[in-house]
From Swiss-Prot:
Region Alpha N-terminal domain (alpha-NTD), annotated ranges: 1-231
Full protein name: DNA-directed RNA polymerase subunit alpha
EC number: 2.7.7.6
Function description: DNA-dependent RNA polymerase catalyzes the transcription of DNA into RNA using the four ribonucleoside triphosphates as substrates.
Swiss-Prot/TrEMBL catalytic activity: RNA(n) + a ribonucleoside 5'-triphosphate = RNA(n+1) + diphosphate
Species this protein is from: Paraburkholderia xenovorans (strain LB400)
Record remark on domains: The N-terminal domain is essential for RNAP assembly and basal transcription, whereas the C-terminal domain is involved in interaction with transcriptional regulators and with upstream promoter elements.
Cellular component GO terms held in the UniProt record: cytoplasm; DNA-directed RNA polymerase complex
Family annotation (SMART domains): RPOLD
CDD domains (UniProt xref): RNAP_alpha_NTD
GO biological process, one term: DNA-templated transcription
Gene designation: rpoA
Alphabetical list of InterPro entries matching this protein: DNA-dir_RNA_pol_insert, DNA-dir_RNA_pol_RpoA/D/Rpb3, DNA-dir_RpoA, RBP11-like, RNAP_asu_C, RNApol_insert_sf
Length: 325
């Protein structure tokens, strides 16, 4: 009798739009389609890292219940429209951008003055309509985060949020807009009781649907790894002793991270040649590296996070035998 579980594979990725895709995976043992599909869906909706406006300062406005002369939208609707702008930051965790426009016409996300390491994914998104003589001057703080953070959490927790005229927004950081899944029947040879998992994913364009699935799977693996490391159980005692397996990504050189030349050279100067060497260093240790500043550190952290890794991780039996230095 077969006791090993079938291992599924992705058999199709169908693009349904620029940021919309359907991913089909099979075969799963019976029941595993719902088990894994629901887990992935929950992680996709709650745990993806993204970017969102968190604070807004509008010239001439003291609170969100104000109106502006020459602007069709009131401040509440203006804030709702600003929350619909999709930002993406590169190698930084926050930035403040400016929106200035005057004269009759439509104000869109493309009118926002951006820093070199910030971009707007939906520049055609409408923010406001100005009439003759209308003027808009807005400062927008954009931050990196995860999930949903109500504005009142920061409003009462940060002194900067108490400044008169600064409006704190509820922030939805998740780059995933919609996720659904369906479980269908699958067949392998004579077995007809297997599952096929079909996932439908739509993002806001900050990440692709395929990358969203990869990141959610890494999060699940990381969270479940603690259970695999349980000690003192009967199963562990009976298991044959063998050297722990090392994630292949840790054996890859830091050059594969495609860091800037400055960051890569700083790491090599500290004898950090492999990704496994890098993740064991803490932020404080890296900041002590000559010529490696906060900007380079943020770049390294972001690149590692995109692969489900962080600084300060602990590895047993590192470096493995036979690893060239």
């Amino acid at each position: 009798m077969q006791t090993s579980l079938l291992k599924p594979k992705i058999i199709a990725v169908e693009s349904l739009g620029e940021s919309h895709a359907k991913v089909v995976m099979e075969p799963f043992e019976r029941g595993y389609g719902h088990t894994l599909g629901n887990a992935l869906r929950r992680v996709l909706l709650s745990s993806m890292i993204g970017y969102a406006p968190t604070e807004v300062t509008i010239a001439g406005v003291v609170h969100e219940y104000s109106t502006l002369d020459g602007v069709q939208e009131d401040v509440v609707n203006l804030l709702l429209n600003l929350k619909g702008v999709v930002f993406k930051l590169h190698n930084r965790d926050e930035v403040t951008v400016t929106l200035r426009k005057e004269g009759e016409g439509v104000v869109t996300a493309g009118d926002i003055e951006l820093a070199h390491d910030c971009e707007v994914i939906n520049p055609d998104h409408v923010i406001a309509h100005l009439s003759k003589g209308g003027k808009l001057d807005v400062q927008i703080k954009v931050e990196k985060g995860r999930g949903y953070v109500p504005g009142n959490v920061r409003r009462y927790g940060e002194e900067s949020a108490k400044i008169i005229g600064r409006i704190v927004l509820d922030a939805s950081f998740s780059p995933v807009r919609r996720v659904s899944y369906a479980v269908e029947s699958a067949r392998v040879e004579q077995r007809t009781d297997l599952d096929k998992l079909v996932m439908n994913i739509e993002t806001n364009g900050v990440i692709s649907p395929e990358e969203a699935i990869r990141q959610s799977a890494r999060i699940l693996v990381d969270q479940l790894s603690v259970f695999a490391a349980l000690e003192g159980t009967e199963a562990t005692a009976e298991a044959p002793s063998r050297a722990p397996q090392i994630d292949p990504i840790l054996l890859r050189p830091v050059d594969d991270l495609e860091l800037t030349v400055r960051s890569a050279n700083c790491l090599k100067a500290e004898n950090i040649y492999y990704i496994g060497d890098l993740i064991q260093r803490t932020e404080n240790e890296l900041l002590k590296t000559p010529n490696l500043g906060r900007k380079s550190l943020n770049e390294i952290k972001e690149v590692l996070a995109s692969r489900g890794l962080t600084l300060g991780m602990k590895l047993e039996n590192w470096p493995p035998a036979g690893l060239d230095k």
